[in-house]
């Protein structure tokens, strides 16, 4: 039932690399090939984002990718088709990243059932109201999907404890206020927040928003983080006119991130 948490726990002290890409971007064929490249080059888990027109938590790079995918007609139906085609060829479990409105429009029960049948193992809904969590959790448990809840830098201690009490096993810690995108460094209070979660709960932590280079990874590894999410920086490597050049660039970048995690983990 908690496939993502169980997977991360099996890695013991090793931090997981979790790349994010937008489903259907820049087109379905390259998206499928990109997922296979990420899997081959060391991704431990992969986040696949469902394109959405009002993606408030996403920065300009991911928003542009979503808009481009939507213009090509990439909606939930097409995302399910991508999952069905590619998951049998992947080792890395897939986590679906979507906003709540598309889930409601599709029908919550239907949506969670469909992503489960397509082979996804996890679900992230960044704008999910805390009041709705119990209902979503019930359906996720029914269909063996792990729901991963968000903790923001502005979350109070009482809210963190409430989120942790509802979380099946893994918390997504947002590295900064605002939207996703490329950043140079992280506020030390994020480290304190991560330490707080680790010391007061038994939950694992995925850290995301703004991670894009080896120096940041070296910093984050020392925070006892269980998984590092890289999104905008990944998407910048699948922009261009020559598909093979894009995939080669993506492979090189993913390999570099994986090496950085491995190296930083060994010197902790």
From Swiss-Prot:
User: Would you name any one GO CC term?
Assistant: cytosol
InterPro entries to which the protein is assigned, alphabetical:
Aldolase_TIM (IPR013785), RibuloseP-bd_barrel (IPR011060), Trp_synthase_alpha_AS (IPR018204), Trp_synthase_suA (IPR002028)
Q: How does it assemble?
A: Tetramer of two alpha and two beta chains.
* Domain of life according to the entry: Eukaryota
Query: What are the subcellular locations of this protein?
Result: Plastid, Chloroplast
Record's function text: The alpha subunit is responsible for the aldol cleavage of indoleglycerol phosphate to indole and glyceraldehyde 3-phosphate.
Its Enzyme Commission number(s) read: 4.2.1.20
Q: Which residues form the active site?
A: 47, 58
Q: Top enzyme class of this protein?
A: lyase
UniProt-listed PROSITE patterns: TRP_SYNTHASE_ALPHA (PS00167)
Q: What keyword terms does UniProt attach to this protein?
A: Amino-acid biosynthesis, Aromatic amino acid biosynthesis, Chloroplast, Lyase, Plastid, Tryptophan biosynthesis
Q: Which PANTHER family match?
A: TRYPTOPHAN SYNTHASE ALPHA CHAIN, CHLOROPLASTIC (PTHR43406:SF1), TRYPTOPHAN SYNTHASE, ALPHA CHAIN (PTHR43406)
Name of one Pfam family that matches: Trp_syntA
Q: Which GO terms describe its molecular function?
A: tryptophan synthase activity
Pathway involvement of the protein, from the record: Amino-acid biosynthesis; L-tryptophan biosynthesis; L-tryptophan from chorismate: step 5/5
Please state what the protein is called. Tryptophan synthase alpha chain
Family, according to the entry, reads as follows: Belongs to the TrpA family.
**Catalysis: reaction(s):** (1S,2R)-1-C-(indol-3-yl)glycerol 3-phosphate + L-serine = D-glyceraldehyde 3-phosphate + L-tryptophan + H2O
According to its UniProt entry, this protein's organism is Gracilaria tenuistipitata var. liui (Red alga)
- Please tell me whether the keyword Nucleus is annotated for this protein: no
């Amino acid at each position: 039932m908690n496939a993502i948490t169980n997977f991360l726990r099996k890695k013991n002290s090793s931090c997981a690399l979790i790349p994010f890409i937008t489903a259907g971007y820049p087109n379905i064929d390259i998206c499928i090939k990109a997922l296979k490249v990420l899997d081959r080059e060391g991704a431990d888990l992969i986040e696949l984002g469902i394109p959405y027109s009002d993606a408030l938590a996403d920065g300009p790079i991911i928003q542009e990718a979503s808009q481009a995918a939507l213009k090509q007609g990439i909606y939930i139906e097409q995302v399910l088709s991508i999952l069905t085609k590619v998951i049998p060829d992947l080792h890395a479990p897939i986590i679906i990243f979507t906003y709540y409105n598309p889930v409601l429009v599709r029908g919550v029960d239907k949506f969670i059932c469909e992503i489960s049948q397509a082979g996804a193992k996890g679900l992230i809904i960044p704008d999910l109201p805390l009041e709705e969590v119990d209902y979503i959790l019930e359906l996720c448990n029914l269909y063996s999907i792990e729901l991963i809840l968000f903790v923001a830098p502005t979350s109070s201690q009482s809210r963190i404890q409430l989120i942790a009490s509802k979380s099946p096993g893994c918390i997504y810690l947002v590295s900064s206020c605002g939207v996703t995108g490329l950043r140079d460094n992280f506020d030390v209070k994020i480290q304190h927040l991560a330490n707080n979660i680790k010391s007061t709960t038994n939950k694992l932590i995925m850290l995301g928003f703004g991670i894009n280079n080896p120096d940041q990874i070296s910093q984050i590894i020392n925070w006892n983080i269980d998984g590092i999410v890289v999104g905008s920086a990944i998407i910048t490597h699948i922009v261009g006119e020559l598909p093979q050049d894009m995939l080669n660039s993506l492979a090189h970048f993913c390999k570099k991130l994986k090496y950085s995690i491995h190296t930083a983990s060994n010197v902790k």
